């Protein structure tokens, strides 16, 4: 089984730049903001997700938003991982040990399962409105690679 890295993600971003709209390291959240978000959520972000935030901030793959960390909810609620997850938990759409990172227009929800957090990582699952959660990726890099390939029409 392949272990995905940030280099794998970077190669796919270069290859499929026409369907990807990510930020850059220059506009990425700093360590203080990331720590504040983690404290507010009561979860430590995975190493792969933190690396993504520091290198790409967040953005979209096709029309699918990848949630990020924003400064003090500056009127940007749609893609803010803290705001979205606190509301999801409050409204019964997620459990405290699930960190939702993306929702598609088709009702798919992708989230980290923190009940399996080990060595700085935990797997991602997805679920549709009508079904049970299904394993999706071993880390955030694999998640990104699979989502990019799916949007590009390449088999994951």
Predicted regions mapped to residue ranges:
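Ampiphathic alpha-helical segments that act as solvent-exposed interaction surfaces
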Residues: 99, 132-155
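A surface-exposed partner-binding patch
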Residues: 1-110, 155-156
